[in-house]
């Protein structure tokens, strides 16, 4: 029996909750949001769909964090959404304050919960939440970029997506790093089957398509929600899938979250970072340095703001 809490049930939160619940991953689901009536009305919607499917999941919608208790997994989507032309880092201060508040309120009533950060900038928010909560936290990281990578290569080379393997690592978003040594099509290295498809084109797609989707559709939802559901599924059923999610590491004395391919199950790890070739590790190390520099600048400003 797995109890899962969904913190923030706006557009992406609703899609994630639907995906998780209808994959049979939660025996009980708690839907929380600050918007009056939203969790309650979303609860009704889900109950109608659950009845149609004949599931037994119990759903509770609430505007009170006091009702979020004894959850096994807590997914955090609460935060301001990314708007067209806005980078994920632009969101840092406002959304970090939300995570600090949640970090103070959630842990006392949810001992042993696994926290999965979804709110952007997702890796930095995971680092902020873990810093203030002292609870093990992961972020969805580059799991989404990884599937964008595979899907684009599959489309361009006209092969099924399940015939493409490979991972994206580093920070989620514009600074993500494609681990080209891991990219294979039908088991063959990318370079052998590229047929004129360049690495630059693939990388540009992976980094630019989210902004294009946001510009036209107002947000990315279905791709991320399905991938996040897969992360939850691998944890709940201890599947041990290798996924590129962001896990905590200490760098320059600060906890930061960086994505690397890692085994995801009831326990998180080990990672495959140690078996990557030097070329990939160098690019990943630079991503870590860049992430830390920007995160530390934002964190220092945040701490001054919080003190005020």
Swiss-Prot record:
Pfam families: Ldh_1_C, Ldh_1_N. The keyword Oxidoreductase applies. The active site is at residue 172. Its EC number is 1.1.1.37. It catalyses: (S)-malate + NAD(+) = oxaloacetate + NADH + H(+). GO terms for biological process: lactate metabolic process; pyruvate metabolic process; tricarboxylic acid cycle. GO terms for molecular function: L-lactate dehydrogenase activity; L-malate dehydrogenase (NAD+) activity. The keyword Lipid biosynthesis does not apply. Keywords: NAD, Oxidoreductase, Tricarboxylic acid cycle. CDD domains: LDH_like. Substrate binds at residues 82, 88, 120, 148. InterPro entries: L-lactate/malate_DH, Lactate/malate_DH_C, Lactate/malate_DH_N, Lactate_DH/Glyco_Ohase_4_C, NAD(P)-bd_dom_sf. NAD(+) binds at residues 8-13, 33, 95, 118-120. Belongs to the LDH/MDH superfamily. Catalyzes the reversible oxidation of malate to oxaloacetate. This is Malate dehydrogenase. The gene is mdh.
